UniProtKB/Swiss-Prot annotation:
Gene ablation phenotype (knockout): RNAi-mediated knockdown in the whole organism is embryonic lethal. RNAi-mediated tissue specific knockdown in neuronal tissue, glial cells, motor neurons or muscle cells is embryonic lethal. RNAi-mediated tissue specific knockdown in midgut is viable but results in reduced adult lifespan. RNAi-mediated tissue specific knockdown in eye imaginal discs is viable but results in age-dependent eye dysmorphia with loss of cilia. RNAi-mediated tissue specific knockdown in wing imaginal discs is viable but results in severely deformed wings.
Job description of the protein: S-adenosyl-L-methionine-binding protein. It is unclear whether this protein acts as a sensor of S-adenosyl-L-methionine to signal methionine sufficiency to mTORC1. Probably acts as a S-adenosyl-L-methionine-dependent methyltransferase.
Protein name as annotated: S-adenosylmethionine sensor upstream of mTORC1
Organism: Drosophila melanogaster (Fruit fly)
GO BP terms: cellular response to amino acid starvation; cellular response to methionine; methylation; negative regulation of TORC1 signaling
Organism domain of life: Eukaryota
Recorded family membership: Belongs to the BMT2/SAMTOR family.
Residue numbers binding S-adenosyl-L-homocysteine: 73, 132, 150, 162-163, 196
Length: 302
């Protein structure tokens, strides 16, 4: 059962989300985001960041309880990243699968010659970009070199950034800041990008897709985008939305390689395919009626 403090913190988070959704209904997503991220709203954003950090601590520090451990989004993400790049070499298994798919599409005459890009052997420390990080929870993993970004950082090791406004630039190797905010990030640089509880914060389906397009450009070939989104429903309740996410991300070159429903969250991993054309062709043959290129969440219909 939630404690009084837990309920108070959750109320702060919910209030911030509802405020942004209301602004979006009144002024549209672009104007709403502009207002939400303006200095006039700095106090609410700071309260939100503090509440999110305290809420996370309630769950993440209860490692001894199996039920709470199962809910740990941080642990889940680190475990899969480790398996994908190191202990199980999943990236090689997925490469072979994509190469077989490519051969079959070519044999059927459905896809011509395409350029494939493969990842070199993963480094000992992976370059990870954690967007909407809040308090840099992945920094404790010794094999992750984390660049943490947030609209309103809760700790000093998180860089301030409005991800929707950040440029992805080829040829640079480090984030570039102006006036204390990240303005540019290196293209094709990261083995992993993490959106943990980020996309549902964005007020529109178009902005969520824009975030994913940014992630694609930031990732190295065969790198992964880890998506963690709130979901307290049973596993099939939001299946149509998750299918549409899978289709939409395949259209931009990201193929889903993992989906797991945990209590209160859904955890997904999408991989930058060896060929964008391959991913797009997969999407075209798996498209179902009513699917479209957008990232919708249940709150969009409320």
């Amino acid at each position: 059962m939630a404690t009084e403090e837990h309920q108070r913190l959750a109320s702060i988070v919910k209030s911030c989300h509802e405020s942004l959704r209301q602004l979006t209904k009144e002024y549209g997503a672009t104007a709403a985001w502009q207002e939400h991220t303006s200095p006039r709203n700095a106090k609410q954003l700071a309260e939100y960041a503090k509440a999110m950090k305290q809420l996370a601590a309630i769950w993440e520090t209860n490692d001894g309880k199996v039920e709470l451990q199962a809910r740990s989004r941080i642990k889940w993400a680190i475990d899969y990243i480790t398996k994908y790049f190191f202990t199980e070499g999943i990236y090689l298994q997925k490469r072979q699968r994509e190469q077989r798919l490519l051969e079959s599409y070519r044999a059927e005459g459905k896809l011509g010659e395409v350029q494939c890009r493969l990842m070199e052997e993963p480094p000992d420390r992976l370059h990870v970009l954690d967007v909407g990080s809040c308090f840099n929870p992945f920094s404790s993993a010794p094999h992750l070199e984390v660049t943490a970004l947030d609209l309103c950082p809760a700790t000093e090791d998180v860089l301030q950034a409005d991800f929707l406004k950040v440029e992805v630039v080829p040829g640079i190797r480090e984030p570039e800041l102006e006036e204390g905010s990240v303005r540019r990030l290196p293209a094709s640089h990261y083995e992993c990008v993490i959106f943990s509880l980020l996309l549902e914060y964005m007020p529109s389906a178009e902005q969520r897709l824009q975030c994913c397009l940014q992630a694609y450009d930031l990732l190295l070939p065969e790198g992964i985008l880890v998506l963690i989104t709130p979901d307290s429903q049973h596993v099939g309740k939001n299946a149509h939305l998750m299918k549409n996410w899978r289709y939409s991300l395949a259209r931009i070159g990201l193929l889903r390689v993992r989906f797991e429903k945990l209590p209160h969250i859904s955890c997904m991993v999408f991989r930058k395919a060896i060929s964008r054309e391959l991913s797009q062709h997969w999407a075209s043959i798996h498209r179902e009626e009513g699917m479209c290129e957008e990232i919708r969440i249940p709150q969009d219909d409320s």
